[in-house]
């Protein structure tokens, strides 16, 4: 297939050929929202209020002349919302698990988050692992090699460390996600085009209605 040519598009770009749903999960306080906001809005807020339930972000990118929209569901990590979050795994193409390099519990709890993905998502879901807050190097308790080993042992699709504060690898995470999902789309498409093949083409996911429905429910719950 050769090297993919990528160009990040503005957040408000609304014309796209493919759309994929991503879910960002992990313990509360690991920087999920800040990391996603840094990647999508190029903005960082030092004291960001914890996510209540969920938030939505969009990351747009052009790959080989195809415009791709990543619909990012940023979830809270608080136990009280765990049952609510479980419904968001449905139709997710990729899950991003985030831990903080200065928080041992957030790393230990990856086993629980991974189990949630495997039991509640579709069997073909891709999984990324992100070690966040590299700007807190002096407080590091989880070494890079530990994250790398966890990713390898569990056959995850991608591992990298990042910092929402400095912006390190924030966009890279979503660029790599888009590249992987686009490549998978081409594989499905090629498989389905072969004579006698029964393989399904990975569909363009129509997520806007799902987002609007969930937003409406969130507003109702907040009243």
Label for each model-derived stretch:
Residues 61, 72-73, 96-100, 128-132:
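Conserved beta-strand segments of the P-loop GTPase G domain that flank and frequently precede/overlap
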Residues 57, 82-87:
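Conserved alpha-helical scaffold flanking the Walker A/P-loop in AAA+ ATPase domains
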Residues 62-65, 86-91, 118-123:
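Conserved catalytic network of the ASCE P-loop NTPase/AAA+ motor domain
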Residues 92-111, 121-124, 134-141:
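Conserved Switch II/interswitch segment of TRAFAC-class P-loop GTPases
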Residues 1-29, 33, 63-67, 123-223:
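Conserved P-loop small GTPase signature centered on TRAFAC-class small GTPases
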Residues 68-83:
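Switch II (G3) loop of P-loop NTPases
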Residues 40-67:
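Switch I (effector-binding) loop of TRAFAC-class P-loop GTPase G-domains
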């Amino acid at each position: 297939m050769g090297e993919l040519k990528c160009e990040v598009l503005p957040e408000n770009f609304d014309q796209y050929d493919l759309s994929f749903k991503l879910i960002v999960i992990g313990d509360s306080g690991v920087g999920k929202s800040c990391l996603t906001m840094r990647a999508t809005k190029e903005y960082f807020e030092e004291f960001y209020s914890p996510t209540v339930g969920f938030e939505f972000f969009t990351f747009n990118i052009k790959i080989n002349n195809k415009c791709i929209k990543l619909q990012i569901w940023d979830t809270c990590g608080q136990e009280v919302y765990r049952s609510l979050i479980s419904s968001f795994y449905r139709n997710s193409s990729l899950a991003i698990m985030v831990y903080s390099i200065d928080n041992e519990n957030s790393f230990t709890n990856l086993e629980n988050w991974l189990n949630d993905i495997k039991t509640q998502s579709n069997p073909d879901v891709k999984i990324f692992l992100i070690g966040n807050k590299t700007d807190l190097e002096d407080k590091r308790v989880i070494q890079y090699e530990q994250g790398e080993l966890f990713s390898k042992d569990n056959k995850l699709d991608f591992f990298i460390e990042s910092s929402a504060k400095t912006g390190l690898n924030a966009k890279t995470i979503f660029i790599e996600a888009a590249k992987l999902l686009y490549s998978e789309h081409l594989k499905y498409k090629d498989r389905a085009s072969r004579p006698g093949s029964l393989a399904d083409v990975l569909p363009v996911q129509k997520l806007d209605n799902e987002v609007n429905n969930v937003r409406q429910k969130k507003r109702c719950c907040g009243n």
